[in-house]
Structures are given as C-alpha cells and as structure tokens.
Amino acid sequence: MAPTPLPLEQMPGVGGGGGGYLPAAQEGGPRINTMSMSVLIDFIIQRTYHELTVLAELLPRKTDMERKVEIYNYAARTRHLFTRLNALVKWGNSVSKVDKSSQIMSFLDKQNMLFVETADMLARMSRETLVRARLPNFHIPAAVEVLTTGTYNRLPTCIRERIVPADAITPAEKRQTLLRLNQVIQHRLVTGKLLPQMREFRIRNGRVTFEVKHEFSVSLTVMGDNPTVPWRLLDIDVLVEDKETGDGKSLVHPLQVNYIHQLIQARLVENPNALSEVYNCLHYFCQSLQLEVLYTQTLRLNYERLDDNNITVEEYVPGVKLTVSYWRDLKSELGYRLTVQSDPSEIGRPLAVVHVPSLGAKESAEVADRAVRSEHLSMERLIVHTVYIRSVSRLSDLKLEFQAFLKDVDFNLQGTPAILTVPVLSPCLRAEQIHITIDTHTGMFRCHVPKHLDCPIMEEMQDCLNGDRSKLPALLSELRFWITHRRCDKTLQHLPATATETLPFLVQPDQEILQPGRHKIYVKLHRHPNIVLVVQLKEKTTMPNEMEYTFHLGFVAYQKDELDVIDDSAMQLVSIVAQPHSDIPKCYTKLMRLIEFDTFVATHGPGTEVDAEVSPHKRKSNGDLLAPPAKQQKTIFPAYFIPELAHVVAMCDEKIPFMNLAQTLSKHNIPHSGLQVEANATSLVLKILALPQPGKTTFATQQQQQQGAPAVAGENKPSGTSGLPKIDSHVWDDLMRRVLSISIRSQTNKNSQVRIWVVEFVFYSTPLQSSHPKEQGSRRTVYLTYEQANYDFSKTVEDLLNDWSKIVYLYTLVYDFAEQLLNKRLSLCDMLVVKSYSYMNLLLGYGPKKEVSCNIYWSVQSHGFRLTFVGGMSAVNGHSMMRDQLAQHLNQQHSITQIAQILHETYNPLSSIAKLPVLPFLGIPRPQVPVLSFCVLAQSPCLIRLTYQAVYCLELRFRANRLVSIRDGASSRFERNVVEEFTPIQGLKAFLSKYVDESAVYRGRASHEDDNPLSPMGMEDNFGGPSSVAGVSAGGSSPFLGTGMRGPQSPRDSGLRFPAPHTPPSSSNPHTPASPHPSAGAGGGSGPQGHGNFNLTSPPAPHMPHPSPSGLMPSSPLNPQPSPHMVHSPGPNTLYMQSHQDSPFTAMSPANNNWPGSPSMPRPSPRPGQSPDHKSTGGGAGVAGGTDRGGSRGTLNRPWAGAVPTLLTHEALETLCRPSPYPNKDINVPDMSPLERFLGCVYMRRQLHRNIQSEETLTALNSTEPGVVLFKVDGLQCQVVLNQMHMQTLHLKVSQLPPMPDKHPPPFQLSQDDLLVIEQYFDTRVAAPPYRPNSLHSICRLLNLPAQVLKDFVQIMRLDLKPELGGDQLKWTVQICLRMPPSAVPIVPSGNACVVMGRMKILFFLQITRIPYGAVIGVGKDWKDSPSLVLPIVYDIQTNVTQLAERTGQVISPTMTAASTLLRRFAEFNAQQNQCTLFPAITDLLTNLQLAAEMPQPPPNQSIGPPVGVGVGVGSSPNPMMPMQQLPQQVGPQGPVGPGGYPQMGPNPGGPQ
C-alpha cells in the first residue's frame, strides 16, 4: 500500500517556516489569518464588554449631552459589529462546498511541490554533498558477535569496572555470613565486660539488641571478626512514655535521636568499655526524661485538678530529683512529702522514691514499683498510692485507740480508700456502724453513719477524731442511744404507734424514770390516746454495745391549763364517756398512773413460741408424731428491729380493746368469762356467758333515763310496744338451749386494713330445716362484725344487743312456722321451700319452680320485720311492688304462714301485672313531659291500683280460688262523684266480659256462698285479702254503704231512672256500684242482682250521675252496630279490604241503612265476641263477667258499669297483661298486651272527641251508637268506632256527605278507593301503637283539606302504604310524618302535630328513603345503609306551587339543596292550571333526586341516615317513639289504570337504572 502523503503545511520546512519554498500569498498554500468561529465570538464579546467598561468609567466626567452621544456611538458600533457577525454566520452555513474544493486544490498543489522538492534535493546531493563523502572502516567481528550471540564480551576492563555492577551473593552465602557474624558478636560479648543492667539481650541476624526495661532499647553489630574492629551502633529506641499528658506522641525528636546516635558512635571508636559507655549515656538520658515527665504531670495536675493547698513542687533539679509535698493542712513538724531521685552513689540504678516521714522499706518499694518502675509512669498514681499507705497507717493507729475501751468488738479496716468501721451496737448492721476514713486531699479524719446521714453527733465526733480524743467514749455512748431511738421508730413504723422523746407535761411527774435527761422514749398508741408506753433504755455493764429495755404503762389525761379539772373517767383504760368539746385545745399531758411491766413475763406468755430441746434417744409419743420438729430454729430478726418493743406494743394494742369491752359488758350486766387465749395461741377471745332477753331495759337506757336523755337509737321503741312480737317462755328456753357459745374476737379486715370485732354465735341445729348445702349439719354458726374505729364501746355492745334482738324476734316466728310447716293440712310444703335460715335471715322460695325468693328479717331501725324479694332466672318477682304492705301485714299478724299463703295466691296475678310496661313515654299529654305508661300503686296485700298514663285507673283485688276482681278506679268508694285525678274508662265492663270464665266464677262462688244471692260486697272481705287467709266470711256487707250513707243512686235526686226505695239502702242494690279510692287501703265491691230492673230508654238520659268525659256510651257486643256496607258503593274495591280480617267493617251485606239518620234495629254483631284465650260458651257472645250474669246491653253500657267489679281468673289476667301480637297481622308493631291496646284505643278516642270540640273545622254529629265518635269535615263524614270483636283497635269509616237540596253538588269528590286508602291509613298509621294524640290532630287537618288537595295526599298515602305501586322509576320511598320528628328542620316543636295550615298554605313533612340498588319492594333486602331524609314541604293552594320550606341562615345538606332545586324546576316547567301539583311534584322528586358522590356531614338539625324499618319499602317513622309500620308483601298484577285516574304504577323490580 502506497504511503499517504502528509499535508503540505504539516511537513517540516514547508509553510510559514523560514525554510519553506511556497510564498505566503501563493494560491494553494496554507491559509493564514484564519480563526474559528468560537474564537471570533469570544473576541467580539470581549471587545463589547471592554468598551462598555471604559464607557462606564468615563461617562460620569462628561456632560449630559456628551454622555448621550457616547452611548449612541457605542450602541451603533456594537450593532454594526454584531450585524456583520450575523452575516458571517449565515454565510458559514453554505461554505462547506467551497471548503471541499479548496482542500482538493491544496492536496494537488502539495503533491506537485513534493515532486519538485525531491528533484531539487537529489540534484543538490549529487552536486555538493556526495562529492566529498567517504565510508568508515566498520568493526565486522563485533557486529557479527552482537548479531549472532546477543552479547558483547570484548568490552574494555576500565569501562566494565565502572559501569557493570558486581554479581550479588547467594542466599546460602548470606545465611552463612550472618551465622558467622552472630558467633563473632557472641565471642565479643563473652570476652568483654558487660554491665548487670545489660544482661538482657538477644542476638539475631548479625546484630545484638540490649533492652533496659522502661528506659531504652539499642542494637549494635561489628563489621569484621578482628577484635580491634569497633562496635557499630545500628538503632536506638527510647522506651520512656507519658501516657497521661503525652497525647500518644513520642517524647524524643528524631533529630535528638540522630544526635545521640552520632555521639555514642563517636565514643565507641577506640573505647575498651564501649558497651558501658552506651549504657551510661542512654541511662542518664532516660532518667532525666522520666523526671521531666513526672515534673510535667505534677504541674498539670496542680493546674487542672488540684491546687497549691493539696500538692506543691518544692524542688526540681533536672536529671537529679523531684520533691512534691502533700497534706499541707495537717500540722506536722516534718510535713508530708515524697522525693523521686536518681541514686547518686550508683549511676546504674533506677529512680528511687524517698518518703518523709519515712515509710517501711516494703511499702516504699511497693510505691516505687507501682508508679515509677512500671510501664505507666504516673505522678498521680504515685501520690494516690502514697496517700493510701499513709491512710492505712493512721487508721491502724486509731483502731488501737478504739480497742482500748471497746472490748470484744470486731473492727474492720479495708477498702480503697481505706475505711475503718466501728460497730456501736450488738447486733449492728454495717449501715449502722461508724465509717471512718481519711480525706485524700487534706489528710483529715472523716466519719459518718450511712443509715443515718443526718446524725447530729457525727460533726462533734469528727472534731474529736481530728483533735482531742478523750471524749470518744462519751460520744459513742450518745450515738448508741441515738441509733436505738431510730431503731424504735423503725420498729414502730408498721405498728399503730408513734415514738417521741418528750411529752408536754405541765407539771413534771415525780417518778424517777420520767425525770429529764434519762434515756427513754414515749410510745403513743394510735387506737388508745390515753395510753402511753414508756420505754427506758440502758447499756449493759458487761457489754456496752448491748441495750436493755424496761417498759412502763402510763395512763395520761389532757388538760389545757393548770385549772382544768380531770374527772375520774380518765383513770379508765379508755374514756367511755365522751369528753365535752372545748374551744381551747388540750395540749398538755398529765400522768395519772404508771405501771411497770415485767419484761420477761410480758415477752413470754401463751402467745409466744417456746424453744425446747428433746433428747434424740427419747421416743416420740403418738401425739408428737404430727407435731413440728422439736428443735426449732430461732427466729432471726433484722438488727434494726427490736422484737421486745414490737411485742409489747402489739400486746397492748390487742388487749386494751378487750379490757374496755369487758368493762362495758360488765356495766351492761352481761356476764362474761374474761379475756382468754385460745388453744394453740391462735388469738384472744372474750366469751359471753348469756345475753338478756330483748325488750328489757339496758344499762345505756337506764343511764340515759337517769340523765333525762332519750334512749339510744337501737332502743327507742314506739309508745305502743304491742307491735313487738311476744316472746313466749318456751320459745326463749328453746333458743337458750340451742345457744352453745358466744365468742368475741378481734380481726383485721383484709380490704380496708381496719380492725373489727367478730362475734361468733354457735347454735345447735335449727328448728327449721333448709335446703342450703351449708346448713345441713348440727352445728350452726353466725358471725357478726363491728368496727373498732369508734372508741364508744357502749355503742358496740348496743349493736350486739340489737343483732341479738334480730335473732330472737325472727326465732319467735320461725318456731311457730316450723310446727305449721309439718302440718300436712296446710300444704305449706307445696307452696314454698325454705332455701336458707341463718338465724338472722329467713329465705323462702316460692312460685311454680320455687325460683323467686322472699327474705324475712328483723329491722332495728323500723322495729319491725322487713321483706325483700328477688326474682329468678326465668321469672320476675312481682311482690316487690307491695313489699311495704306485706311487711305491715307480717308485723300485725306475726305469722309467716299467712304471708306464705298470700305470696302463693298472689304470685300469678302479680307476675302478670309485672309484665306491663312501666317505662316513661314522651308526647302523651305534651311533647316534652314524660308520662309513665303503667304505674302500680299497692294499697294492701290484696288490693292494688293500676294507672295508665296518669289518666285511667284500674282497681285490682285478689281473691281466693285463683280469682281477681277488676273495677274502674276512677269511681269513688265513698261518694258518687268521680275521683278528680282519673277519668272513667268507657267500655271497661264490656272489654273485661270477653275474658270471663263463667265456670271458674261459679266454682269460686260455690265454695263460699249459700243458695241465697250474694250482696254486692259478697266477694270482698273487710280485711282486703283472700278469705282463706283472713278467715272472714265472704257474705258480709259493705262497710262503706251502711246506715246513714247513700249510694250513688240515692233517691234524693230528682228525675232518677230508678224508683225511690221503700227500705233503707242495702248492699244488694244492683245499681249501687262501689268505687275504690287511691287512699283506701281496703274496701268492698258490688255485684248486681239477676233481676232486670233496667230503663230501656235509648239513648240514656243526659242527667245520669256518672257522666263520661266525652259524653259517649261504652260499646258492647250486644249493641246494634251499623253494617259496614252502608257507606260503601255496591262494588267496592277489595284491594284495601283484604288486609283487615279483624275489622268489623269487612263483612259486607247488600242491605242498606239510613246511617246516620235514625237508630237501627237490634241485630247480631257481625262476629261473635269471645275471649282470645277461650271459646265462647253457650250463653251467647260477650257475656258480662264478674257479678253481672245477666249480660244485658244496658248493664254493660251504663257509665257506672266499670265501677262494678268483674271477676277474672288468673289465666284471663295473664292473657290481659301478656304481650301478644297485634290483632291485625298485617301491621308489624311490637307485641303489646291487650289491656294496653284497649286503654290506648279508649285514650285515642277520648282525645279525638276533645279534638273535635276544640277544632273549629271539625263538626261533631250526634250518634245513636254508644262509643262511636261521629264528626264531619269539608265534604266528608267520619265515624271512629272501636272494634267490638276484641276492642283493641280503632277503625275509621269515611263517606261523602250527600249534597244539600238547595246547593249544587261539589265539583270534585273522592272516589271510593280513595276513601278506603284513608281508612286503611288511619288504621295502620294513626290508631296503631304507639298511641299519640298528635297523630290524630295531623290526620284531622289532612281530612279538612279541599278535596282536590286531599286527593293528592291520598295518593301519597297510597304510595306510603304500598311502595311497590311506584314501579321502576321511583328511587325513593315516601312516608308522611304525622308528628314532628326531632331530626327535621326545627320549624315545629318536636313531637307536635306537623301538619300546619295557615294563609292558604299547608306545611307538612315527608320522610324519603333511598331504595338500595337491586332491591325489590317487599322483599327482604338490607335497608340499614340506605340514607333517609326528612323534607319540610310547603304547598300553596292559591298558586298551586309545591316547594321546600327553608329557613333564613339555615345550613342545609347538598341533598336538601338538590331536592329544593328539583321542586323549583318542577314548579317552573311542569305546572298545570287544572291539576293539583302536589303529588306530581313529589313523584318527580322521588324519581329524579340523586345523592351526592360524597355525602357531607349533615348539620345537627338535619340527619341523613338509614331508615328505622328494615325489610320493606314502607320505611320508618322519623320519630323514634313511633315504630315502623309494615305492610304485607303484595306483589301481583294490577289494573291498567291506577286509583284516582293516574296511570298505573307497575311493580318496582329493582333500583334506579
């Protein structure tokens, strides 16, 4: 490949050089004066910036016009320059073609010039150079040798020696040479003189290394085997270090090491003792360095941590010695100092330490070895160890001084720093010993007791140790007593006592022990303020470290001054009579008595352990086999615990209350055996021999009677003591025989840690056998507890006597009851079971399963027996409501047998009554006032009153043979007026007659009556209880209607329905009802005779003496009722009639009637009226129960008929009171008792009548039917009637009013289907539980609306009742709120009627609930998460506009805003003049209302949540007191046209599409 020629400008000698052949401007040559574009731009910018800088410097000196001219010129030049640059850049984009052509031309020019130059050079060589050229004589052999062999061996010697290095020796030769050198060095050391300090060396690799510990290490060698060859110094390593202040750096600089190396090497030449010279030089240098290090450390220690008072450098001679003094505060003649110096007599020895005063040779050498002759050269260690040695020496001397006056005491000297411990007591804790040490800085003695750092004696003892030591024995004795005092405090820390050293005596006692200055303490007992224990402290003569204790018991009294007189009661152990309160505190103490204890007797008694040793060879008896080991280990107490003191204090604290109690028992004339110790020394016991019979005068009563004060609370009996049970002598003797023992002990409550008295009664069996598993043995114990906190022991005894009275009085009843329990004729065992009898309480179980209980006990406060009742697992105890009446009966009769029979016979009816709800309800009379649904008022054990919502009252009397009489409690028993608090119940007699069982009533009469008819009071006795219990004949007359009293139908009234009697009024008058009164504890009932003395006038006279609150007669099944077809068209729609199976209007008849024109003819009721729980007998439907066997319509419908008692069986009462399903099965409401439903319907009917009278828009109409409310509204006639089948539901009958003859017919009327919807809505929403009168107000206001508006409301009612009629397009269900819900906008007060009309506007509330996606109305779908909304709707009748009611400033939720927007849009675009827009607007709202994606939290007055009702589309009531009403699932094909002419709404198969 041909070589590529270089460019011409890159060739040497061509181009711009001086030897080139091309002219500079010749075409084809290299282009000069060219530069790159980037350099050009840099130059332009640099020029512009430079001109701008110069301009900025020169302009301030010129005038304004000159500055403007210069700025303009600068801008013009710069603009022109950059314009040319811009043109150049644009041209450069197309210069590539020109460059290629120029490169080609340049290459051709270069080739041409290359040939020309080659020819010229060859010509010059031939003409000038080669003329004189000659070839040299080449060295052919050398060239051949180099080329063939690659080496050259003919190099001259002079060159070879100077340039070529010699060959290296082999490793074997090297090892042989070093081994030979080691032998030479070893021979030199053996034959030469070697110092003892240099005996440690090692020979390795041809060198010898000498090492002197803690000073230096040096290496030497020799350069030959000639003895005259001098040693050569190889290496020097100084081993002196400063590990405290050196900071890890070397103490010797390398230049110093080099200098020493040169110096020693110079001295090694021609020196016979070369090695000695090496040691002397290096040893002196290292010792000087060590002294310098110690001096530096001392200065730094003195500067940083210590001062001149602790250590001071007294003298420092470099390289010679260093003297440091310490403990400068001690007054020593020589002073304490140490000197570190070199040995002047022998240079080779290390540094020595000299102590002043001198120490022993062993201690001094130990100090030097620790601090100087070690790797860690430290002055601090040297001083510390010196101080430790000095401290041990001084403490040893002090120990000898202590041993001089403290014999047989174990002293201990140990520790670092050294501590001397001196025990002052025996035994003594280490923390209680005196710890003596020496201050390392000052050398002074320091002492303290670790357990008592605040000991005041330590300061004086420390001064004594550092000064005059003659006072040490006395100070030790004071310290011994002081620590003993502290031990006493520690011992009493967990005992109820406090130790003190002095008492505030106003006059110093004469006793020697109480004189000042004696070593003693006073122990105050917390529970006994008048007792002081004096503890005298003494040192044993033989052993001063041991203490002796002497105890004295002192009785003290408190006085405020010298004139204060102290009575004799202070001489007692504890003052029983409370001292009068004084304004001036009694702060001074006076000693009354002082008793000395024998310490041995006090600490050794029946309550202490006995140490006994038994011979190992002695055989144990049978009684000793189970005993603990004979040799018991002695209890070891802590040294700070004084067992003698604790034992004496505990003994006093335990026995003093017993002594006080024993004194109090003696004063109450109660015999006892005194304080004793129980077997095995378990506790103290005080046994009572006998207790007095209750009711007798006690000591406290006698004392108070003597002082003129009333008796104590436990004995202040009422004036009439006849109410107390009589204690027969044989009963008392039997109880005394059963009492085995009465013991009093003292214990501590585990929970409150309070001491209590425990009184144990031990009885022998009981006369009454119980079923309790713990009461089956023959030994029965009763435990009573009393507090010891109070110091009034008389009260404790009185409480004991009161509890004893509980046992005795209850025993008097139990003794008789036990005998009667064995009598099989009374059958008490079948009535009850005795669950427990503990002598204090009698627990009886009764009822069907004997699971309810009655507890009988004696109450001291009420001086009578009390009863408490407890229910069972599956039953409640209904006797709790008449607990006081039963207790009163027991206190009067004193017979448990009668109480048992009453409990047995009244259990079933009271259990039935207990099932009635007693919860308070809101919204009955007023929305904010709660009223009890039922309230039970007990009058006697067999008479109660039952009120309903504080309006109606029932009087129930329990009778024998499982019968109960019920009458209206609103009628007074004493006069013919009505009780003001209550209202008579209309139709009560007819309602109760449906539950009468005639056979049971006849059986009850057969057992108590003669052949003669009964009087009206025949079924009631004077006592008020069952005749079997009271034993009173049932044929007595009424005690309230005797001579001188007129009955309710007195002949003095003119115009009465009955003729005046010719004989005085008697109890056999059938028209003289007896009425109970709440204040009557007992009374009688009435029952009319069987004759028919009745006035058949219909309706009854308005002047009857028993008016009804509404003026209506009670209905009866025998009353002629209008047929349900009289207000229906011939072809009624059965869609809304099929769900009312119990309604009296469901039976259709083609007959017509002129209702409400004239009274109809009597005919049978559509359905027979029979009790829900028994079939109708052959006597006809609706036979009047109780005492009216005739069952005539007139008797049942009389206003006073409810006042006549009606006899019911227990089963019928249970049926009345037990919650049962609603008669209309289609209405889903909570179960409710028939009695509550009947009273609720009567109450609603009464409220409706009052509402008709108060509302101007409602017009009352006269009705010939009793118990029927008839009224009319605008175009409609309404009839509200009680269902006569069961009298538990109200029904509404609506019909169009016929047009007046002189008026035109109304332009718009409701269809028959609309009327059926109204009736059904009234039955399911208004007259259904819970019964609220405000719902009636709302429905009446809706009925009074114009027919066209009412029709739209009827459509909403239809959608409310049957949501499935809405079809698929509805997304919400709707409900009409009849009462104001609390969750709605507060426009109307909560609970009030929320349908408001005024100024041609209607305000009502709707609750809408979102239908879940995919849900089908009527199918069980979970609705709990469906949001619900209460909308306040306002409909304007004049403008025909439906809108949302909004309050100014009210914050509403986004959903409410969307609903308001929909209603406004509907009013704007869908308004029709000839059609009411209410229902279409609501339908549009239910169809198009959408929920926001993120529902915000609603305001407090507007809650959005799931509906209350779950499972159907009916929704829920917005008021929590009105439960949800449900309709049955009715899904099926409907007609093509819906009710009212609106298009038919198909079923809703799912949610919104």
Curated annotation (Swiss-Prot):
PANTHER family: MEDIATOR COMPLEX SUBUNIT (PTHR12809), MEDIATOR OF RNA POLYMERASE II TRANSCRIPTION SUBUNIT 14 (PTHR12809:SF2). Residues 1081-1090, 1177-1193 have a biased composition (Gly residues). Residues 1131-1155 have a biased composition (Polar residues). GO terms for biological process: regulation of transcription by RNA polymerase II; regulation of transcription initiation by RNA polymerase II. This is Mediator of RNA polymerase II transcription subunit 14. Its main location: nucleus. The lineage of its organism: Eukaryota, Metazoa, Ecdysozoa, Arthropoda, Hexapoda. The modification Phosphoserine is found at residues 615, 1015. One of its GO terms (molecular function) is transcription coregulator activity. Residues 1099-1108, 1159-1169 have a biased composition (Pro residues). It comes from Drosophila melanogaster. GO terms for cellular component: core mediator complex; mediator complex.
